[in-house]
């Protein structure tokens, strides 16, 4: 695997060569589903790059966003591949009540509509 914190942006593109994207286990995500999701995000962002659109960066509160954040922001000197897990998600400020869950769904709906 490559040292993603050193070489990749959060949209899975190379830091010094825009338009070149990486995906899968070589980026430091581990697992079939994680590799597939990184390929989907990288492919989506490559199409957006070719169409001169801004990249899609998934919110860090989602597993897709948390994995992309982890592989691009962790310590370069100790970078190790990571599977999807609750440990890479940011802490919630409070216990999630029904109203907050509703707000979370609204935020995700808004994000999806912005794609």
Located regions from the model:
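An active-site-proximal "capping" alpha-helix that borders the catalytic cofactor pocket
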Residues: 35-49
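C-terminal auxiliary extensions adjacent to catalytic cores
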Residues: 79-115
């Amino acid at each position: 695997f490559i040292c993603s914190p050193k070489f990749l942006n959060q949209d899975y593109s190379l830091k010094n060569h825009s338009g070149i994207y990486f995906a899968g286990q070589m980026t430091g995500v581990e697992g079939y589903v994680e590799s597939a999701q990184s390929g989907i995000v990288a492919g989506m962002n490559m199409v957006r790059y070719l169409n001169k659109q801004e990249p899609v960066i998934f919110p860090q509160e989602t597993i897709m966003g948390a994995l992309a954040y982890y592989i691009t922001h962790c310590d370069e000197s100790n970078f190790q591949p990571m599977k999807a897990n609750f440990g890479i998600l940011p802490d919630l400020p409070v216990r999630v009540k029904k109203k907050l869950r509703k707000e979370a769904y609204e935020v995700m709906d808004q994000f999806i509509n912005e794609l």
